[in-house]
Design a protein with these regions (language model features):
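Glycine-rich phosphate/pyrophosphate-handling loop used in enzymes and phosphotransfer proteins
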Residues: 1-178, 182-210
């Protein structure tokens, strides 16, 4: 046990998916697992979309779905930097004028129960990678029921008015970060609140699309 702890301290990290040592320092996903991840295209959003760009590099399939659930519901926080690493690789698909990051907020009760906000844990390393600030004062003011199992109409109704921004936003182009996009109801409602607070343009970067 002591020898393995020493090895882990001086050797590269272990892959979060298979446990093998990664060959590159600070890499959380080995080359083999990275090649096997269910990647999908991120086409330009339709003209009716409120977003400048919407990027989700992975499909919500195994092993991505299992890893996201483990992060959120089993407190497997080691997945967060791995997802951030994958999002940093996808940042080349984003516009180059983004000037601040907004992780999707949790209601305070859910965050207290969970102990963390998964979007914030993923968003912090991405913000550091891009050299951008995290926007403060963005709040989920209503404890909405879980979105799981709801159709698109019910998801939108469930989230109506859920977000508020408690300060004027001076940044012109914001990047919302989330773990999964399903119908897009969450990020659209957050986008609406950000625009009311002064944002001119909003893009979205999520780990996966369901």
């Amino acid at each position: 046990m002591l020898l393995r702890a020493f090895d882990d301290a001086v050797m590269p990290l272990r892959c979060v998916f298979c446990g093998a040592r990664t060959r590159e320092p600070e890499k959380h996903v080995c080359a083999g697992c990275d090649a096997d991840l269910p990647r999908i295209a991120s086409p330009p959003p339709p003209a009716s979309s409120p977003f400048e760009t919407e990027v989700a590099p992975l499909a919500y399939e195994f092993p991505v779905d299992a890893a996201i659930k483990a992060l959120k519901f089993q407190r497997k926080l080691f997945y967060a930097p791995a997802f951030a690493e994958l999002l940093c690789d996808a940042c080349a698909l984003l516009p180059n004028d983004i000037d601040a990051i907004v992780p999707v907020p949790l209601h305070w009760r859910r965050r207290w129960f969970r102990g963390f906000n998964q979007a914030h844990e993923i968003g912090k390393p991405v913000a550091r990678y891009l050299g951008l600030p995290l926007v403060r004062g963005v709040v989920r003011r209503r404890a909405t029921p879980s979105q799981s199992g709801l159709n698109a109409h019910d998801r939108a109704r469930n989230l109506r008015g859920a977000f508020v921004v408690r300060r004027t936003i001076s940044h012109r182009h914001l990047l919302i970060i989330d773990d999964v996009i399903t119908t897009g109801a969450t990020v659209r409602q957050l986008c609406r609140a950000l625009r009311v607070a002064g944002a001119e343009r909003v893009s979205v970067l999520a780990v996966a699309r369901a």
